[in-house]
Amino acid sequence: MKYLASFRTTLKASRYMFRALALVLWLLIAFSSVFYIVNALHQRESEIRQEFNLSSDQAQRFIQRTSDVMKELKYIAENRLSAENGVLSPRGRETQADVPAFEPLFADSDCSAMSNTWRGSLESLAWFIGYWRDNFSAAYDLNRVFLIGSDNLCMANFGLRDMPVERDTALKALHERINKYRNAPQDDSGSNLYWISEGPRPGVGYFYALTPVYLANRLQALLGVEQTIRMENFFLPGTLPMGVTILDENGHTLISLTGPESKIKGDPRWMQERSWFGYTEGFRELVLKKNLPPSSLSIVYSVPVDKVLERIRMVILNAILLNVLAGAALFTLARMYERRIFIPAESDALRLEEHEQFNRKIVASAPVGICILRTADGVNILSNELAHTYLNMLTHEDRQRLTQIICGQQVNFVDVLTSNNTNLQISFVHSRYRNENVAICVLVDVSSRVKMEESLQEMAQAAEQASQSKSMFLATVSHELRTPLYGIIGNLDLLQTKELPKGVDRLVTAMNNSSSLLLKIISDILDFSKIESEQLKIEPREFSPREVMNHITANYLPLVVRKQLGLYCFIEPDVPVALNGDPMRLQQVISNLLSNAIKFTDTGCIVLHVRADGDYLSIRVRDTGVGIPAKEVVRLFDPFFQVGTGVQRNFQGTGLGLAICEKLISMMDGDISVDSEPGMGSQFTVRIPLYGAQYPQKKGVEGLSGKRCWLAVRNASLCQFLETSLQRSGIVVTTYEGQEPTPEDVLITDEVVSKKWQGRAVVTFCRRHIGIPLEEAPGEWVHSVAAPHELPALLARIYLIEMESDDPANALPSTDKAVSDNDDMMILVVDDHPINRRLLADQLGSLGYQCKTANDGVDALNVLSKNHIDIVLSDVNMPNMDGYRLTQRTRQLGLTLPVIGVTANALAEEKQRCLESGMDSCLSKPVTLDVIKQTLTVYAERVRKSRES
């Protein structure tokens, strides 16, 4: 209830705040209006100032023109003075000039003596002034020119116009200025003197200018002019009723057009300024004051303030009207908003109060516990009686866990077992209540349901235990059958190499096929049983996916060749050299897919494509077999499921292989998919994550950069892969169309070359070739299509074979030097298992090799110390001394004979460990006769060459 009361108070406060907002908006409009009026006033002041400046320019021109006249008259007077007699020379006169008489300026002035002395000078000056008046004075509007002697201060008046002379006024003005001039400091006495006296009517006066005349650096006389000044000439035509006043240097009014009542006195604020613009004290007038050089006078223009405001009066009235209208509009809007928003909101608050009371009653009467918990600390804000009872059953730890779950917002329900063994299921949703984040919780007693689920779980566990027991039984039986089967299969393989009576060979072949199928079935059942009983674990470690793929193709290549199929293995350059995973299980999956592809393909080829796909390693197995119908693809990975009818039923199997593959890949965090069409073949794609991937360095094979290889490959996929691989190694690749090669060029083809190749070598990719590349004739190499990624290494050996021909370890075996009689080779077989040891010895005997056996590494060292051994075939994992320690001990004794490891763990790291211990090679069980023959041929030839050297 307090919440709703607070809400109503908030609404009331919001109403007052809205009114305050309206007032602030009105004040903002008022301030904007004032700013606009002030801006208009400044603009009007700028216009008036511009008009004042233009008018003052006319006054300045008047003063400047008078100053120029004084300079001309002074020049005339000084240049006509005779330096010899101190008089103006009258030469050049043609007419007689009127000579003015001297008049005393002071009572003690003696003008009679001066009249006689200056008679000639005055006559000459009068003639020149008369000449100047007739030709130039009209342009300057002068009234008279006068000359005053410097000693006795008598004045000679040269009238230029016929106008009455107010002698007393003029003499008084001259008397005052002459005294001022004579008493001035020496620095100021050499400058011109300007003043103005009032005329017969307002706005008209007389402007006087006085300048000294020197002769031989001695003041001889004072020359002056009088000119009528009219203030009306200092106005521009306009609408402003402006006044104009000229002040002296002390700020006293000399002449004004506005009348004595409006005369402006000098203001200390602007008397020292050359130019000043502003309002007078009391803001009665707007004035502009400017000096009039070269005189010491100043001119002041003024205009009443009411005339300034007259132009913006309408702007002021409009602004006032705008503020009144804006205030009325804002007041109306505020009232309307209150009536339509705030008043209805207060009514809604009252209704909410009623609704909350109603909801409280519903919650209190609910058959389940309902409560509201604060998200921050889990405190119970509101709850019914049942929820209160349930919450009291919870322990402190349960309350803390419930609070953490609510804060985490990861799940929406939790099951809790209370202290009295009551099972509560608490579900909740997040919401807002009283301005807080809360969780609305519903508590339900699910004890009955939990007991039922426990009963069902016990039944399921019993069934699971029975299933696991069955799986364990199958796994145990299958494992016990596998060991003797290895001996059966190996001996049957050896028996097939013997000369058998007619009909017996068919029986042996059937026995061999049945044994292999039985071994495959037992292995699948064992793996599936381990998966079902959760005993099969993924053992991740670092391995090389390249080595795993090479090993798989090497195992299945003989079977592919026997079926007259082609096996292409494309390992892209972006495949990591190492990653973390379970190589044994990956090998099992790919081997199963490859085995199925061989089994269901009668013609065509099989492609194994390995590449990096983002963060995954993608392995694709594609065949040209019978294909799978779309409706059966969805059940392809079900246990014991076999595809279709007809031809598919001719292939035996348990139907567990793909189910095991899917489960293994899923355990490795990968996925497997299939794309198939009947009659077109199938494509299986396996993806595993690239955990801890290490990528190869992007650089070419040393020594191959710039070499040229010609491609004449019909298979488009093989051609594209070879081109990319060779270019990555720095080799120049060109399509061969019959061009003439250079002696260093190599031809790469997948068909028989009709004519002799004139280059360095020919490499032919053959689907029937098994094993490492062989040189069948000088410069003619045969290469398996199952390992095209090894072509750059072969090319490196082809180009370097002449440089390293003296090293027998780098020599390649060739078929023309193969030895069919191997009785000169003594091979030591080391294996702790008697059947495997005997089987391997028999296989070597069938190939013509001499053989000795040893039980373990210690026994092998004893045999080596007493007999000459050429090659050692040793099991890796043996008691007493394993194959690794045997090899290391052999190398420590200084023996360099080839040591070949034989292991059941045919993984990349196992082979790498064998090589690091000092072994020359490593074979994987089961070891077939073909693999033994091919491997021993290489090392036997190496031993024979070392004997010859």
Swiss-Prot record:
It catalyses: ATP + protein L-histidine = ADP + protein N-phospho-L-histidine. Autophosphorylated. Activation probably requires a transfer of a phosphate group from a His in the transmitter domain to an Asp in the receiver domain. The keyword Transport does not apply. Residues 357-425 form the PAS domain. Residues 705-805 form the ABL domain. The keyword Kinase applies. GO terms for cellular component: plasma membrane. Interacts with RcsD. This is Sensor histidine kinase RcsC. It comes from Escherichia coli.
